[in-house]
UniProtKB/Swiss-Prot annotation:
<keyword id="KW-0460">Magnesium</keyword>
<feature type="binding site">
    <location>
        <position position="94"/>
    </location>
    <ligand>
        <name>ATP</name>
    </ligand>
</feature>
<feature type="binding site">
    <location>
        <position position="128"/>
    </location>
    <ligand>
        <name>ATP</name>
    </ligand>
</feature>
<feature type="binding site">
    <location>
        <position position="255"/>
    </location>
    <ligand>
        <name>Mg(2+)</name>
    </ligand>
</feature>
<keyword id="KW-0808">Transferase</keyword>
<dbReference type="InterPro" id="IPR003846">
    <property type="entry name" value="SelO"/>
</dbReference>
<keyword id="KW-0547">Nucleotide-binding</keyword>
<comment type="similarity">
    <text>Belongs to the SELO family.</text>
</comment>
<feature type="active site" description="Proton acceptor">
    <location>
        <position position="254"/>
    </location>
</feature>
<feature type="binding site">
    <location>
        <position position="264"/>
    </location>
    <ligand>
        <name>ATP</name>
    </ligand>
</feature>
<feature type="binding site">
    <location>
        <position position="127"/>
    </location>
    <ligand>
        <name>ATP</name>
    </ligand>
</feature>
<dbReference type="GO" id="GO:0000287">
    <property type="term" value="F:magnesium ion binding"/>
</dbReference>
<feature type="binding site">
    <location>
        <position position="178"/>
    </location>
    <ligand>
        <name>ATP</name>
    </ligand>
</feature>
<dbReference type="GO" id="GO:0005524">
    <property type="term" value="F:ATP binding"/>
</dbReference>
<feature type="binding site">
    <location>
        <position position="264"/>
    </location>
    <ligand>
        <name>Mg(2+)</name>
    </ligand>
</feature>
<keyword id="KW-0067">ATP-binding</keyword>
<feature type="binding site">
    <location>
        <position position="185"/>
    </location>
    <ligand>
        <name>ATP</name>
    </ligand>
</feature>
Length: 491
């Protein structure tokens, strides 16, 4: 490791200075042969980073932690977590480092974080490395989520390391440079609470308020206001996942952010045929994190968050619990509002349509989609075509997706009678998402050294609402011979 000139990049070490008990100073491993696989130039510009420098030797060393700016203090962060319902008191960044924070061109403090940078004291016997495929998967999906308007961590770059990674096969290694509003998690609070150090817990809460929810500082009960703000942010986030058919796959408490951003894309995937029981993760044997369970699991995680904050709510435990339970009502209210508003937009419903009528229309449609195994993303885009005409030909692309034509036609007639707005529908219903078969195709090619399929896929999913000639295959569901899809965390 070496130190960069002061004028290159200015990183802060706010997390380490304010919460040293939650951080271990550490250095990235030195890698033999760095090769830039993908660089997010628009994001780099937002961060005030010179893209030409990032592409050069020093920039690549910076993106892998091998060149540290003067004054920076790379750390592995400590946190706990409930993993598939079981509490693990000591998790932490086993193969990641927080390089530091910088201020972007909008004045926001952002984390620069490395994934796959080598083993840390939290590695739990792992090698601390990451393979090209999983790192590029996170790059593709996180940038697609950003383009879809969903709060998410961002991907700045993926750099090949020249070091082999030994998994089920020998794979080329890579480091992902990730950008986030912060990496504070529910698990961060669980770790602080487990220490029994009330001062640490309070400082962590104050840090979270200052960084993410500053309005809570002026509330009569700031820590209760923090809890309510996180509950509201997560309720909104999960509703947005549900609206686009996103399945996170590993909703452990250490993967739930205080900022309300989506984080950690290991076993994630997008649902194709609509089914609330959709599961992709190879280790989610009981469907705990199935698509339809995501709101319930989010609530469960937030209850664990509330438990950590009880000492800050009140010295009286019963009173603290009562306050938490009352505040938790924010979740369902916010979730229902974001979901209902989003579904109305997906259906192009005018504002004057009665809420109860709209809810019944939505429920009936979802039942039809499930019963007919209809591709979720394609359907809503094709339905927009049906809103552009009253004849059967305009509706035919959507009708062709159903076996129960009488059932769908009856629903279609009621929907058309409401005067849906086709242009509004096209603004919220994507035509391109990271289709599972196309992601696998791009990752396999990239692992073999061919980045063209990755570049094409990124071109599609980072402009998801604009239909373009030559991109037809990126709008199509997986072929039947693709089979049942499973994902793996890549650890």
């Amino acid at each position: 490791m070496s130190v960069a000139p002061e004028t290159t990049v200015a990183l802060q070490d706010r997390f380490f200075r304010e919460l040293p008990e939650l951080a271990v100073r550490w250095q990235a491993e030195t890698f033999p042969e760095l090769r830039l696989l993908v660089l997010n130039e628009p994001l780099a510009t937002q961060l005030g980073l010179d893209t030409g420098w990032l592409r050069g030797p020093d920039g690549l060393r910076f993106l892998t932690g091998n060149l540290v700016p003067t004054g920076a203090a790379p750390v592995a962060q400590a946190y706990s977590g409930h993993q598939f319902g079981g509490f693990v008191p000591r998790l932490g960044d086993g193969r990641a480092l927080l390089l530091g924070e910088l201020v972007d061109n909008k004045g926001r403090l952002r984390d620069i974080h490395l994934k796959g940078s080598g083993a840390t004291p939290f590695a739990r016997g792992g090698d601390g490395l990451a393979a090209v495929g999983p790192m590029l998967r996170e790059y593709v999906v996180s940038e697609a989520m950003h383009a879809l308007g969903v709060p998410t961590t961002r991907s700045l770059a993926v750099v090949g390391t020249g070091r082999p990674v030994y998994r089920e096969a020998t794979l080329p290694g890579a480091v992902l440079a990730r950008v986030a509003s912060s990496h504070l998690r529910v698990g961060s609070f669980q770790y602080a609470a487990a220490t029994g150090n009330r001062d640490l817990l309070r400082r962590l809460a104050d840090h979270a308020i200052a960084r993410h929810h500053p309005g809570a500082a002026d509330a009569e009960q700031p820590y209760l206001a923090l809890f309510e703000a996180v509950v509201a942010a997560q309720a909104s986030l999960i509703a947005q996942w549900m609206l686009i058919g996103f399945v996170h796959g590993v909703m452990n408490t250490d993967n739930m952010t205080i900022s309300g951003e989506t984080i950690d894309y290991g076993p994630c995937a997008f649902m194709e045929a609509y089914d609330p029981d959709t599961v992709f993760s190879s280790i989610d044997f009981w469907g705990r994190y199935a698509y339809g369970n995501q709101p319930v699991i989010a609530g469960w995680n937030l209850a664990r968050f509330a438990e950590t904050l009880l000492p800050l709510f009140s010295e009286n435990t019963e009173e603290a619990i009562a306050l938490a339970e009352r505040s938790f009502g924010v979740f369902q209210t916010r979730y229902d509002a974001v979901w209902a508003t989003g579904m109305r937009a997906k259906l192009g419903l005018p504002a004057q349509v009665d809420a109860e009528f709209a809810a019944a229309l939505i429920d009936e449609l979802l039942a039809l989609l499930k019963a007919n195994h209809v591709d979720y993303t394609s359907f809503f885009r094709q339905l927009g075509r049906a809103a552009r005409g009253d004849d059967r030909s305009a509706a035919e692309p959507a009708r062709e997706m159903f076996m129960d034509l009488p059932g769908f036609d009856a629903w279609l007639a009621r929907w058309r009678a409401l005067g849906p707005d086709a242009d509004a529908m096209d603004r919220v219903n994507p035509i391109y998402i990271p289709r599972n078969h196309l992601v696998e195709e791009a990752l396999a090619a990239a692992t073999d050294g061919d980045l063209d399929p990755l570049d094409q896929l990124l071109a599609a999913v980072t402009a998801p609402y604009t239909e373009r000639p030559g991109f037809e295959r990126y709008a199509s569901p997986a072929p039947e011979d693709f089979g049942k899809y499973q994902t793996f965390c890549g650890t």
